Amino acid sequence: MTNGFHIRYLQRQEIDIARWDDCVGRSANSLIYGFHFYLDAMTAGQWDALVLDDYQAVMPLTWRRKGGVSYLCQPAFTQQTGIFSPSAITPGLTDAYLQTLIRHYRFAEIFLNHGNAHPTLRTQVNLVLPLSDSYPVLESRYKKDLVRNLRLAAGAGLV
């Protein structure tokens, strides 16, 4: 138990895939990078996980081994991983995950997703478009030039 959170380290073969994908899919910060099929494809199944309680929050741990030392790394074509949860991810939860992570790996070079805030982490520019609103609401925010260009493209049969 770390900071009041019960986080378990699971090896790939111990993970309940249906519950894993359900947790990632229902997360407000859901990304394809967190689903098991993507992780399996990008790491040849060489990933483990940190799981909170009964899959309330999950974090994939993509690892490699060099010189007998296991370390965390970002897989190719994977912008970000980190913690996925349908509930709010607090800095306290992020801290508990990081504390659990450092007990298992001596070195890590990973990029957490935009939903994993923590005061001690270095942030990078990450352009995330919030597209959860309906299309008419999104369309109402278009600039006049874009609306004009879309109308012209539709008139020319391009869209």
Give, region by region, the residue ranges found by the protein language model.
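Short Pro/Gly-enriched beta-strand edge/turn motifs at strand-loop
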Residues: 29-37
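Structured helix-beta-strand junction loops
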Residues: 26-27, 45-46, 104, 155-156
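Conserved donor-binding loop and adjoining core beta-sheet/short helix segment
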Residues: 5, 15, 22-25, 37-96
